[in-house]
Structures are given as structure tokens and as C-alpha cells.
Amino acid sequence: MARIAGVDLPRDKRVEIALTYLYGIGLSRSHEILDATGVSPDVRVKDLSDEDALKLRTYIDENYEIEGDLRRWEAMNIKRLGDIGTYRGRRHRQGLPVRGQRTRTNARTRRGRRLTVAGKKKTPAKK
């Protein structure tokens, strides 16, 4: 089983797809890596030779920030925005959309589930 940056790649998938299971590597970057290392994108992970797996592992470790390092870098950037008091940092802290989207309607992903506010109860009419 190929293990890169602490992540087990799925054995039955093609290498070009399996590399996208690493945080920070998408399909286009996967193609770049395979072209640079000379590994065929059509080979399955279970059929990958130890030599090819080692080539992939060393190339990725030397040239890309992935997984924990990338997550830590992103978290530090967001924290930095909050520390210097920017509008974007404040929006991150409040859990609201950061890039100017409207929030009166929509923005459900960032704001969470709807909380219904109980309406004023009607009192029975007096006779």
C-alpha cells in the first residue's frame, strides 16, 4: 500500500486519482507530479512498484506543501488577519462570508442552520 505524507492512498484507484486524496493536490497538480516523475497515470496504486512509490513520495515531499503543513499555513494566515484587525479577519471570527456575499438571505453554509424565532402568540378574543 502506498503511503504518502501520512495518508494511505486507495489501492484500487488509478495513481492520478489516488494522489488527489492528499490535501493540497488536485487533478492538475497530480498530472504535474506524474509527468515530472515519469510514472504512468493509468497504473493502479496496487500495481505501483516500490521504486515508483518512492519517486512520488520524495518528489512530493521536496516540492510541495501538503496535508498538515498546508493546513497549519492556512490557519496561521487566517489568525494573522484577525490579529491585525482586518475586516476579513473579523468575518472569519464571526463565521460569516468573507468575500462580500450577501447575508440577508443565503449564506446558510457559513451561518449554520436556520433558527426560527417564535412569533407573538395570539391571545384569544374577548367577548
Curated annotation (Swiss-Prot):
GO MF assignments: rRNA binding; structural constituent of ribosome; tRNA binding
Region Disordered, residue ranges: 90-127
Database matches in PANTHER family: 30S RIBOSOMAL PROTEIN S13/40S RIBOSOMAL PROTEIN S18, SMALL RIBOSOMAL SUBUNIT PROTEIN US13M
Cross-referenced HAMAP family: Ribosomal_uS13 (MF_01315)
Cited NCBIfam families: uS13_bact
Keywords: Ribonucleoprotein, Ribosomal protein, RNA-binding, rRNA-binding, tRNA-binding
Name of protein: Small ribosomal subunit protein uS13
InterPro entries: Rbsml_uS13_C, Ribosomal_uS13, Ribosomal_uS13-like_H2TH, Ribosomal_uS13_bac-type, Ribosomal_uS13_CS
GO biological process terms on file: translation
Biased composition (Basic residues): 101-127
PROSITE patterns in the record: RIBOSOMAL_S13_1 (PS00646), RIBOSOMAL_S13_2 (PS50159)
Described purpose of this protein according to its UniProt entry: Located at the top of the head of the 30S subunit, it contacts several helices of the 16S rRNA. In the 70S ribosome it contacts the 23S rRNA (bridge B1a) and protein L5 of the 50S subunit (bridge B1b), connecting the 2 subunits; these bridges are implicated in subunit movement. Contacts the tRNAs in the A and P-sites.
Family: Belongs to the universal ribosomal protein uS13 family.
Gene that produces this protein: rpsM
Subunit structure, as described in the record: Part of the 30S ribosomal subunit. Forms a loose heterodimer with protein S19. Forms two bridges to the 50S subunit in the 70S ribosome.
Keyword rRNA-binding listed: yes
GO CC annotations on file: cytosol; small ribosomal subunit
